[in-house]
């Protein structure tokens, strides 16, 4: 079902990390395996064929078999990213939005308002300065490709909590940064929400696919934009790698008085 694990691995490599594609069953069988990594990414695709609901079965795998290892991973200061189906997994497993009284059923992701699979490019506007994956204030242009991408909150109180506690990471906007209806908001997400972060700023989930825009030739109009075009998607991965190097590995190196150790990232696949 997962079908963007190779692109995600490639994006991490471009950003300077060593990435391993790890089957979720290996993590379940060896729960200490996760400890050797610094970034955990749940890639996009259709895990378990989207049976029941998109991301639901893998979310149940996480809830029943990996809740403690993943929680410890986050508590240790490491990073978690969920892309498209991976975002659905993080939400349905209760990892996002996370903390401060949120219940698993307060937020979910459901079918697009159009009733169709939406495959198009969209602009995203960052909504927070605390998420380590994000460059605050800079619009990014990336593709979406999903049939169930509509973020919904249980009620107005749950939505207000997302807003007031800084959980909204990205919103869908136009080229000028303004929110709007379809196709600007491709799925009808409440408050134009395209991505969420947790209270630490080290867990990010988003419906669009940054791993599909890490080379300039992947832009739909790349030939008109010149050789200096810096792909927007790769910045998310660079920021993650930079954070690990500057915050986690340098601290470890200082404690051991040795050189900066190598780090790696893992992407689980069903």
Spans of model-derived segments:
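Fold-independent oxyanion-binding glycine-rich loops
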Residues: 24, 43-45, 83-86, 93, ...
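N-terminal beta1-alpha1 cap of cysteine-dependent amidohydrolase-like domains
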Residues: 1-83, 87-99, 110-118, 154-157, ...
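Structural motif
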Residues: 19-20, 38-39, 78-81, 88, ...
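C-terminal and late-domain segments of enzyme folds
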Residues: 126-253
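Class I S-adenosyl-L-methionine
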Residues: 96-99, 103-137, 143-144
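A short linear-motif detector with a strong N-terminal bias
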Residues: 18-21, 37, 59-60, 100-105, ...
């Amino acid at each position: 079902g997962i079908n963007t694990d190779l692109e995600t691995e490639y994006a991490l490599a471009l950003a300077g990390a060593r990435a391993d594609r790890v089957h979720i069953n290996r993590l379940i069988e060896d729960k200490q395996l996760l400890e050797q990594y610094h970034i955990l990414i749940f890639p996009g695709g259709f895990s378990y064929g989207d049976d029941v609901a998109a991301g639901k079965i893998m979310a149940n795998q996480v809830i029943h078999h990996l809740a403690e290892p993943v929680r410890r991973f986050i508590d240790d200061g490491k990073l978690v990213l969920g892309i498209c189906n991976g975002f659905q997994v993080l939400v349905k497993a209760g990892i996002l939005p996370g903390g401060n009284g949120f219940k698993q059923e307060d937020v979910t992701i459901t079918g697009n308002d159009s009733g169709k699979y939406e495959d198009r490019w969209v602009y995203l506007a960052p909504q927070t300065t605390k998420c380590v994956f994000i460059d605050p204030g800079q619009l990014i242009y990336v593709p979406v490709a999903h049939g169930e991408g509509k973020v919904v909150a249980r009620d107005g109180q749950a939505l207000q909590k997302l807003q007031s506690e800084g959980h909204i990471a990205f919103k869908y906007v136009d080229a000028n940064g303004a929110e709007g209806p379809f196709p600007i908001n491709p799925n009808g997400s409440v408050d134009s929400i395209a991505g969420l972060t947790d209270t630490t700023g080290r867990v990010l989930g988003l419906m669009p696919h940054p791993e599909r825009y890490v080379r300039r030739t992947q832009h739909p109009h790349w030939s008109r934009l010149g050789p200096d075009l810096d792909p927007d998607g790769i910045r998310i991965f660079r920021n993650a790698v930079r954070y690990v190097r500057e915050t986690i590995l340098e601290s470890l190196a200082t404690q051991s008085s040795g050189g900066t150790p190598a780090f790696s990232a893992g992407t689980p696949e069903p």
